[in-house]
Amino acid sequence: MPPKPTNWRMYGKMAVAGLTCCVGGPALIYYISPTEEELFLKYNPELQKRSLENRVGKQEDFDNFVARLKEYSKSDRPIWVEAEEAARKKRSGKIEEQAKLMQEMQQRKEEIKKSGTNLMPGGSL
């Protein structure tokens, strides 16, 4: 029995369909997706004003975030480990700061007690 002939018509249809899906799909999405400017113009005036006011702050936050990511990526360890360690250091720094404030408050109370000033809660000066 001779081998079956190659069905070039079927392979051609499959190639055209695959090319249409692979190229046409993203092209269609690119064509129908609105730009940031078009979305901004669809906002009501109050939202446009608020968005313009918050734009600088959001940009600064994003820049800080990217700077931190660059700093974390300098290490050999994964970024999430570095971020967790930085958060832990920040928390411990806040705890130490709170402890210092409490100690200063205690010292002030002791100074007031030693000076002999009698403070009454709710009293007038």
UniProtKB/Swiss-Prot annotation:
Chain segments annotated as coiled-coil in the UniProt record: 92-119
Disulfide bonds: none
Gene Ontology terms: biological process: mitochondrial respiratory chain complex III assembly
Keywords of the record: Chaperone, Coiled coil, Membrane, Mitochondrion, Mitochondrion inner membrane, Transmembrane, Transmembrane helix
Keyword rRNA processing: no
Ranges where the record places region Disordered: 103-125
GO terms for cellular component: mitochondrial inner membrane
Subcellular location: Mitochondrion inner membrane
Keyword Chaperone: yes
Membrane-spanning parts: 10-32
Principal subcellular localisation of the protein: mitochondrion
Membrane topology reported for the UniProt record: Single-pass membrane protein
Protein role: Essential for the assembly of ubiquinol-cytochrome c reductase. It has a direct effect on the correct occurrence of the Rieske protein, core 4, core 5 and apocytochrome b.
Family of the protein in this entry: Belongs to the CBP4 family.
Name listed for the protein in its UniProt record: Assembly factor cbp4
Gene coding for it: cbp4
